[in-house]
A protein has these predicted regions:
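Catalytic cores of histone-lysine modification enzymes
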Residues: 1-91
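C-terminal SET catalytic tail plus cysteine-rich post-SET Zn-binding segment of SAM-dependent SET-domain
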Residues: 83-179
Length: 179
């Protein structure tokens, strides 16, 4: 799981992104999402990381109700962008979040996973626009929010870890723990 296989560079999708430095095989583990482990209460206190971008955080919600804050003691995994047609998946295993390849990834290709953000609110056009997706995939949903049917099935333990965003921070601690 060497981070030398990936590197952070400028992304055409959003700011910084993570790119394959060498070819990566389907199933390979690329990196662990690291950062300080904090409570939702602390995440709420720290929010927003950048007032100019209130919907952008480096939070990753864990099944335990804790949050990984990738801004503090984080690594390059925090720069992996969202795509509606991802080549990777983030998975929680024993309280750790690992990113692994869903398919072969070519050298120079940007690494993506589907954030699948779960919001405890009705998905209005305005809300979808707040979490607009710019991945450019052929079947782009237009938003980083999980499809409503995916939200209902989001309770799979140990699978499909979700990157926590400002919407989670805007909700109450109890609601945010539903991730």
């Amino acid at each position: 799981m060497s981070s030398r296989r990936i590197a952070v560079r400028r992304s055409g999708v959003h700011g910084k992104g993570v790119f394959a430095v060498e070819a990566i095989a389907a199933g390979d583990r690329l990196i662990e999402y690291k950062g300080e482990r904090i409570s939702w209460k602390e995440a709420l206190r720290r929010h927003p990381h950048n007032p100019a971008e209130p919907n952008h955080t480096f939070y990753f919600a864990l099944d335990s109700g804790k949050v990984i804050d990738g801004k503090v003691d984080g690594n390059s995994a925090r720069w992996i962008n969202h795509s509606c047609a991802p080549n990777c998946e983030a998975e929680e295993i024993d309280g750790h979040v690992y990113v692994h390849a869903l398919r072969d990834i070519a050298q120079g290709e940007e690494v993506f996973y589907d954030y699948g953000l779960v919001i405890d609110a009705r998905q209005t056009k305005k809300l979808k626009k707040e979490y607009e997706c710019r991945c450019g995939a052929r079947k782009c949903r237009g938003t980083m929010l999980a499809p409503p049917e995916k939200e209902k099935g989001a309770g799979k333990a140990g699978k499909s870890a979700k990157k926590a965003k400002a919407s989670d921070v805007k909700t109450s601690e109890k609601k945010a723990k539903k991730k």
